[in-house]
Amino acid sequence: MGVRVHVVAASALLYFILLSGTRCEENCGNPEHCLTTDWVHLWYIWLLVVIGALLLLCGLTSLCFRCCCLSRQQNGEDGGPPPCEVTVIAFDHDSTLQSTITSLQSVFGPAARRILAVAHSHSSLGQLPSSLDTLPGYEEALHMSRFTVAMCGQKAPDLPPVPEEKQLPPTEKESTRIVDSWN
């Protein structure tokens, strides 16, 4: 198919070149059969021809580039970057988390205190053994659990509410009063 496209493009280019060289004679016998267009002065036609030729050239260049790259990859010459290594660091305590949340309390308000309460509750449930001298390996770190998850059927422990979040639910009389006011 690529050869067919090249032949068609070359024949069209040759046709325009030959057509531009022909001029109509002034003493034409039948004006209907006479070519009166001066192709040399029609710059927009030549612009389209040049753009088409440039697109064809870019297509050929990209095709050659792809063929070269694919042949290199099949031959095994492509020495890509080595795979990434992941380092997992385990902390014995959440002091970094606590200091971060404490410093951001002014920005986040009660939400930061709630996160801090969750961090405290989880850090007291499962600490890493302090006898570890070195950091665990990657496989060991994958199997470690940082947070305790409640088993199916168990209820997660309730955290005490933050003072800003304490709001008394409306009593039954107040809720009926609110419903009546809507009606």
From Swiss-Prot:
Any idea which UniProt keywords this protein has?
Membrane, Signal, Transmembrane, Transmembrane helix
Q: Which InterPro entries match?
A: TMEM52 (IPR038942)
Feature: compositional bias, Basic and acidic residues: 163-177
Entry GO CC: extracellular exosome; membrane
Entry keyword annotation includes Transmembrane helix: yes
Q: Has keyword Secreted?
A: no
Q: Localized where?
A: Membrane
**Any Pfam family hit:** TMEM52
Region (Disordered) location: 158-183
* Name of this protein: Transmembrane protein 52B
Q: What species is this protein from?
A: Homo sapiens (Human)
